[in-house]
Amino acid sequence: ELYLNTVKQDTKIAKLRNYKSSLEKAVLDDEATVKVYETLLKTINEHIGINHEYTSLKKKLLNLPDIHMYDMSINPFNQTDTTMDIEDAEELVLKALAPLGTEYVNKLKEAFNSNWMDAYLSPNKRGGAYNMPVYGVHPYVLLNYTGTNFDVSSIAHEFGHAMHSYYSDKNQNVLEHSYTLLLAEIASTVNEILLAQYRLDNSTAKQEKIALLYLSLIHISEPTRRSWI
């Protein structure tokens, strides 16, 4: 009944405000259109077989008779993970993001050297990772860095958000500098892809390449592995 009332409320508000549907009103929050939404669903459905193949392969790797949602969070390649000092991780990210241009890389290096990031675990600190834009100052990035491949990727991801915020603040006034979640995740995902490609291109060990490919996959196909933005 609660769900039904929510649907009725959304439908009524959409009608009162002259939207064609409650869906049109909902996607407008991300400055998207119904066409974009429908295209996304259509594309997912057309390629869902790839995800089925991936799930079957993971079941085989984990040697399970059946696979459940809680099994999907298990990393079968943990044994190939390495521990990387944060200074080395930052240098790796800088090299990987070189295609974004000298200005971008130099500003990112400045961010690393100017304490934009609270990187390490500490008592009572919240988990995950996060970027917080602060207009007129600079973005602040929260991490809980332990040196894993996932953490290295998180640096690229969160500073994708941070640099997006920096450039938006630099070029927009205080009323127009914010951006939608849909747009935000493009900036962060591009950084992750560039980092993954750079590491794959510069890796010679087969098992390391497989582990890096898996890391890229879970960021796309298992978004619940991320508990942050």
Features from the language model and the residues they span:
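Cation-handling catalytic/transport regions enriched in His/Asp/Glu
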Residues: 1-221, 225
